[in-house]
From Swiss-Prot:
The keyword Oxidoreductase does not apply. The chain crosses the membrane at residues 84-106. Its main location: membrane. It is a single-pass type I membrane protein. PANTHER family: COAGULATION FACTOR (PTHR24278), TRANSMEMBRANE GAMMA-CARBOXYGLUTAMIC ACID PROTEIN 1 (PTHR24278:SF37). GO terms for molecular function: calcium ion binding; serine-type endopeptidase activity. Residues 21-66 form the Gla domain. This is Transmembrane gamma-carboxyglutamic acid protein 1. It is found in: Membrane. It comes from Homo sapiens.
Length: 218
C-alpha cells in the first residue's frame, strides 16, 4: 500500500499549485491548462490532470519544455544586457562629469592668462612727476613744505641713479644747483670793453650833487 499511495508531504510537493497574480481575472475568464502553463510554471502532473490523456500530455509537455528552454536562454541574454547597461551608463556619466570639470578649469585658466596679458605693468625706472604745490600749502611740523621735500627726494634719487650707473660723484656745484651760475660767470664776453669817455660820462651822470652846508656862528 505504501507504494501506491504517497504521504501528504510528498503529494503536496508534486501536486503543488502556486497562486496566480491575476486570480481575480481567473474567476471571470476561465482559462485552459495551456494558457496557464504559459503564464506560469506548471508540472507534468497538472498537465496530465487537465488533458486526462497520456499521449496529449506527452505531446504538450515536449513542446512546453522546449518553449521554456528557449525563454530561459533569452532570459539569460537579457540578464547580461541588464547587468552591463547600467555599468556602461554609469561610466559614461562619470566621464561626462570629468570632462565638464576639466572644461571649467581650462576656461578659468584661459581667462586668467588673458587678463594677465592685457594688464600693462608700470615701468619701475620711471619717476612720478608731481605738480608744484599751491602757494597756500600748509607746512608740516618740521617747517619744510611737502614740495620742497619732494624736490629733495627727487634730487637724491637722481644722485643715487648716477652712483648706481658707476658715474663719478657729482661736484659741489651740481649738488647745490649752481652749475648754470658758474657757467655764466666763466663765459667770455663777446661785447668790446667801454671807452674811457663813456665811463667818465656815466660816472658824472650818476654822481649825486653835493649841497654845501652853511654854518652860522652866533
Amino acid at each position: 500500500m505504501g507504494r501506491v499511495f504517497l504521504t501528504g508531504e510528498k503529494a503536496n510537493s508534486i501536486l503543488k499549485r502556486y497562486p496566480r497574480a491575476n486570480g481575480f481575472f481567473e474567476e471571470i475568464r476561465q482559462g485552459n491548462i495551456e494558457r496557464e502553463c504559459k503564464e506560469e510554471f506548471c508540472t507534468f502532473e497538472e498537465a496530465r490532470e487537465a488533458f486526462e490523456n497520456n499521449e496529449k500530455t506527452k505531446e504538450f509537455w515536449s513542446t512546453y519544455t522546449k518553449a521554456q528552454q528557449g525563454e530561459s536562454n533569452r532570459g539569460s541574454d537579457w540578464f547580461q544586457f541588464y547587468l552591463t547597461f547600467p555599468l556602461i551608463f554609469g561610466l559614461f556619466i562619470i566621464l561626462l562629469v570629468i570632462f565638464l570639470i576639466w572644461r571649467c578649469f581650462l576656461r578659468n585658466k584661459t581667462r586668467r592668462q588673458t587678463v594677465t596679458e592685457g594688464h600693462i605693468p608700470f615701468p619701475q625706472h620711471l619717476n612720478i612727476i608731481t605738480p608744484p604745490p599751491p602757494p597756500d600749502e600748509v607746512f608740516d611740523s618740521s617747517g619744510l613744505s611737502p614740495g620742497f621735500l619732494g624736490y629733495v627726494v627727487g634730487r637724491s634719487d637722481s644722485v643715487s641713479t648716477r652712483l648706481s650707473n658707476c658715474d663719478p660723484p657729482p661736484t659741489y656745484e651740481e649738488a647745490t644747483g649752481q652749475v648754470n651760475l658758474q657757467r655764466s660767470e666763466t663765459e667770455p664776453h663777446l661785447d668790446p670793453p667801454p671807452e674811457y669817455e663813456d665811463i667818465v660820462n656815466s660816472n658824472s651822470a650818476s654822481a649825486i650833487p653835493m649841497v654845501p652846508v652853511v654854518t652860522t656862528i652866533k
